[in-house]
A protein has these predicted regions:
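Leucine-biased recognition of intrinsically disordered, low-complexity hydrophobic segments
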Residues: 2-4, 24-25
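Intrinsic low-complexity, disordered N-terminal segments enriched in polar/charged/small residues
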Residues: 3, 9-11, 18-20
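Catalytic cores and adjacent flexible loops of soluble metabolic enzymes
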Residues: 33-346
């Protein structure tokens, strides 16, 4: 039976300011055994990586059939007990624009997320932030967003990039003043389905303005899966030099099968923070061909096999993915949900 409901969770005690992420041990990464052979010649990878699960927002918003709130709450609660440290629970957007997220407030109030797991929400504008702040005791992080390309930004939020920047740079200090961690997401950072190439210098300039306004973290999104590993490595190598002191996060889509290759390229450049979606759910509902975030299960498996710690229980994560398949009534795109984790014999 899948209509189990989670009891209304008690108000969480939240320490103001950015969430503290406890260092992870390499031994935590070895769910099925780290890769058993040395790989000389490769750049050293980070010892650990932090994963921000965006499936409950980025994944659910793309589903054409309404997902019952009870099911959303149960799936989010399951994710919160996998070892994930950060979960983007929902977005406060207009219900007529994204009907699937019309229950944002109800979901946020009902999820039973334990201490130590950072709750994030996405907001598009001042109205969205005001709605989110009505639930300030249930939130740790608030993300704002815009696109690097003019056409995609018009399609997504009906504003020019400059207009979006003007509004968002006013929101970021308000988020911090509420005791929450402000972050920003830049879509079409590696290419636009309408305009094609997006200059990296343009993306860095947008990111710099957001950082100056108070964004502690900036996520760079490959919105329609146009990025390639060589491009990603060069992009983040320069971004880490251009934006010192800002946490840089990579968000890849697997639209053309290059998602995990791009993750590896970002790791080799020095990035240790990633966004992904359990079951490979999601994408962006507006541009063509934008389906398929990198699957969290596949990402965690690859990281663990390379000896990069995440602190995530892969078996528990797979159980949440299987439950999501049942709720949605179809197989999901995660390779690990089909093949299972790697098992080393001998």
């Amino acid at each position: 039976p899948l209509l189990l409901t989670s009891p209304r969770a008690p108000t969480r005690t939240r320490v103001p300011g950015p969430p503290i992420f406890t260092p992870l041990l390499i031994s935590q990464a070895r769910g099925s055994g780290a890769y058993p052979h040395p790989m000389p010649g490769l750049d050293p990878l980070p010892e650990r990586a932090v994963i921000r699960e965006v499936g409950p927002r980025d994944g659910f918003q793309n589903e054409p059939d309404r997902i019952p709130t009870d099911d959303k709450v149960r799936l989010i609660d399951a994710l919160a007990h996998t070892g994930l440290r950060r979960i983007e629970v929902t977005s406060f957007v207009r219900a007529e624009v994204v009907p699937q997220l019309a229950d944002a407030a109800d979901v946020l109030e009902r999820v039973g997320i334990p201490e130590g797991v950072s709750v994030a929400v996405l907001v598009p504008n001042a109205q969205g932030l005001e709605a989110a702040l009505e639930h300030v005791e249930r939130i740790d992080e608030v993300a704002v967003f815009l696109s690097a390309s003019e056409t995609h930004n018009r399609h997504n939020v009906n504003r020019s990039v400059d207009e979006s920047l003007a509004g968002l740079t006013e929101l970021l200090p308000r988020i911090a003043a509420a005791g929450l961690r402000p972050s920003a997401s830049i879509s079409t950072a590696f290419g636009c389905p309408y305009e094609g190439h997006v200059a990296a210098e343009r993306v860095y300039a947008i990111a710099a303005q957001l950082a100056e306004a108070g964004a502690q973290e900036i996520s760079f999104g490959d919105t329609t899966g146009m990025a390639n590993p060589r491009q990603v490595r060069a992009f983040f190598t320069q971004a880490l030099r251009t934006l010192p002191g800002v946490e840089l996060t990579a968000h890849f889509h697997n639209t053309r099968g290059q998602g995990l290759a791009n993750v590896l390229a970002a790791l080799e450049a020095g990035v240790d923070s990633f966004e992904s979606s359990f079951g490979e759910l999601g994408g962006c509902p507006f541009p063509p061909g934008a389906t398929g975030n990198v699957a969290t299960e596949d990402l965690v498996s690859m990281l663990h096999e390379m000896g990069v710690a995440t602190g995530i229980d892969l078996a528990a994560l797979l159980a949440a993915g299987r439950d999501a398949q049942t709720v949605l009534g179809r197989p999901l795109g995660s390779h690990l949900l089909t093949a299972g984790p790697v098992v080393w014999n001998g």
